[in-house]
Amino acid sequence: MEMGKWIHLELRNRTPSDVKELFLDNSQSNEGKLEGLTDEFEELELLNTINIGLTSIANLPKLNKLKKLELSSNRASVGLEVLAEKCPNLIHLNLSGNKIKDLSTIEPLKKLENLESLDLFTCEVTNLNNY
């Protein structure tokens, strides 16, 4: 199902500002980007986007209260630099199973001051000698 429709179903007659957890697993992203997710989800603390075909998270909206972001089993390799600005309170980030090949891709994650957990399982970057 298309991501925008999936979000509409997940709202269940609530406003975006009422939602603290959003599960978009296995929905379909259009052109590898997030769609239908806006900064109106201002109370969102958990976002699951597992296996939705993402290639970039560059258009992620500002989600100040987001603490846990699940991006596993996608094809994302660009856009990680927006996380520190858009999700400054992120504690857990799961990027396992993405197309992350070099350290420069994850370098911007150093700016996430509250990050406690980073999962890069099966990402090619973990095979580098200086990882």
UniProtKB/Swiss-Prot annotation:
| Recorded superkingdom | Eukaryota
Q: Where are the LRR repeats?
A: 18-38, 43-64, 65-87, 89-110, 114-131
What name has this protein been given in UniProt? Acidic leucine-rich nuclear phosphoprotein 32 family member D
Asked if the keyword Transmembrane belongs to this entry, the reply reads: no
Per its UniProt record, what Pfam families does this chain match?
LRR_9 (PF14580)
Q: Identify the coding gene.
A: ANP32D
What are the entry keywords? Leucine-rich repeat, Repeat
Q: Which family does it belong to?
A: Belongs to the ANP32 family.
Instruction: Give the matching InterPro entries.
Output: AN32, Leu-rich_rpt, LRR_dom_sf
